Amino acid sequence: MKKLFLLFALLVSAVQLSFADSALTSTEFYKAYLDVPIVKAAAERPHHLSEVAKAYLFDETNPLDVKLALINAVGPNPDGLATYGEYIEYCIQHFPKKKYGIAPNKRVTIQDIYKNASCEQMAALVYLYAMNYYSDTESVYGLMENAMQTPLTNKQSFMLPMGLVVAHTASAMNDLGNIYPAINYYVNSPENKDMRPKAIEIVMAYANRYKPYANKQ
């Protein structure tokens, strides 16, 4: 029984270690945006999404690359976070019913949020969800696939979180050979390079650690 328990403990530790070093948890590209007040504030209080931060994410006029940096600064937490749920509730409360033909007395649902989200809004939702629930790789990957079915934009900021999710899933499956190709493709193939070069440098520094594995395939 002791040996069985020890084996289980070792397996759990190995899984936790793999999640601790993944594309979602080990790419702190927010550091390239610390001159932006909203990102700096999030970095100073990680694992918390302020009302100001929620409003920033919700505002479609704000640039997606800064939104991603904000979410990245909030960071992941192995014990779980409430930030995704809190942001969804914010979206529900501030959803423009008239714009989307929803009756004033009808309660907005999470389905309404996703149904009417733009591709950039989907990118922020996917990334925030992934950083909250990164240990649930199946759900995270499924949400990413849904986002990729929306009308896409050929922007680096949209593709970045998708690539991080794909690479994270590969890491969870111990498929090390697909980590570098996934990140390299999703990050570097878009024509619109709207992420800061330093942010991409941070992400690719992580990806390059796995490049030798890709070369073996």
For each feature predicted by the language model, list its residue ranges.
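Sec-dependent N-terminal signal peptides
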Residues: L4-A14
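Residues that mark the junctions of alpha-helical repeat units in TPR/alpha-solenoid scaffolds
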Residues: P63, S118, K155-S157
